[in-house]
A protein has these predicted regions:
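Pol beta-like nucleotidyltransferase catalytic core
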Residues: 2-99, 103-118, 129-370
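Catalytic toxin/effector domains delivered as secreted proteins or via bacterial secretion systems
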Residues: 121-124
């Protein structure tokens, strides 16, 4: 009888021990699930919390190792300790990897931590952005788009350098395109039928002054040359949502009214007093209608100078606008990536594809050869 009792007690003890072990494992799993995103994370202190964030720039940028992006920010200079490096030997320390969309063949070796996609090019020239399978591999976006997780448009706050006075502007329309995208060049060609356009770029060039100084600072030279023109053609290479680049900054800096062809969302890049600083091609039925308006303004100093009000009044209130937040950011863009990671602001199911239809002649009311 005693032997039977001992066996029963031993069996019950064994069952109780197994139960306790299972309970501990379940509890550890629950804690782990609460503290880790599905794509993985790195904890770097004793209680499992992350105290510093290391992002490895895994790809090149247009084939060049981007060593210029490297830097580190201690807590205080950034809400979290943050480091960005191109040192791939530190792969086991990584909190995230960043990949440039135009160098998308360089994929990180592990998906145990988030992947960040960086681009300042639009989907027409970067087809992977419209590839659902490719985009689903990434968990955070840093791009030119103002609706990106981390907006990083190629468009800086314009300066308030006074413009050349109206009476001293000797040129009418300035243009300098290096990419001869066919629709914008056809529009410019038709515009030239009704109004003089001085073209310094590689497309329909009729002026050579800019070519002579191309070996210096090209963008600075372009800005300085355009200062004596009343208008500058700012025709972006496609009409993709939010695609705005430094062409518009250069024209605004020069005090030469930008004549803009591109995204319907351009107003989101023109907060405060900049709202009335540009002329939008889309507001005109044809190149002839646009030409008539530009000629009218060129002979009306008061109306023309209304586009320059922001130069004297300042940019104005840009609080609460996405582009204003970008211009007035307290922390560098690299730090903002670390903050997004620390707050768990990642897309665990991946990013959505970004569609963009290639520009067509009919989008701008023109017929080729007309």
């Amino acid at each position: 009888m005693n032997s039977v009792r001992k066996r029963v007690i031993a069996l019950l003890s064994f069952i109780l021990l197994e139960f306790l072990i299972i309970a501990v494992i379940v509890r550890q799993t629950e804690v782990g699930m609460m503290s880790k995103p599905s794509v993985g994370s790195r904890s770097n202190n004793e209680n499992g919390t992350q105290v510093s964030w290391l992002i490895i720039f895994w790809s090149t940028i247009f084939g060049v190792v981007p060593s210029w992006v490297e830097g580190s920010w201690k807590k205080g200079d950034c809400p979290v300790a943050c480091e960005l490096t191109v040192n791939k030997s530190r792969v086991n320390e990584a909190s995230a990897f960043i990949v440039h969309a135009r160098d998308a063949h360089m994929i990180p070796p592990t998906h145990s931590v988030p992947w960040i996609l960086f681009t300042q090019e639009n989907p027409v020239y970067t087809p992977v952005l419209n590839d659902s399978e490719f985009m689903s591999k990434f968990n955070l976006s840093r791009s030119y788009r103002l609706d990106s997780d981390i907006p990083n448009p190629f468009y800086d706050v314009p300066d308030l350098k006074p413009p050349v006075p109206f009476s001293e502007k000797t040129g009418l329309i300035f243009a300098a395109f290096s990419n001869c995208e066919p629709v914008r060049i056809e529009y410019m060609r038709q515009l030239m039928n009704f109004v003089p356009v001085d073209s310094y770029g590689g497309c329909l060039r009729n002026k050579n002054d800019l070519v002579l100084i191309y070996g210096k600072d090209f963008k600075l030279a372009k800005t300085e040359l355009s200062r004596k023109y009343k208008f500058t053609l700012v025709f972006f290479n496609q009409d993709c949502d939010y695609f705005v680049n430094d062409q518009m900054t250069h024209a605004l800096n020069a005090g030469s009214v930008p004549v803009v062809m591109g995204t319907d969302k351009v107003d989101e890049f023109l907060p405060g007093n900049l709202r009335n600083a540009v002329i939008k091609v889309r507001d005109f039925k044809s190149p002839r209608h646009l030409a008539d308006y530009l000629l009218y303004l060129s002979g009306n100093e008061t109306q023309y100078n209304s586009f320059m009000d922001w130069k004297w009044k300042g940019i104005g209130n840009i609080t609460g606008t996405t582009i204003g937040n970008y211009w007035q950011a307290h922390y560098p863009i690299e730090c903002q990536m670390c903050v997004a990671l620390s707050q768990g602001r990642i897309h665990k199911e991946g990013l959505q594809a970004i569609p963009c239809k290639r520009r067509a002649y009919e989008d701008w009311g023109i017929i080729p050869g007309a």
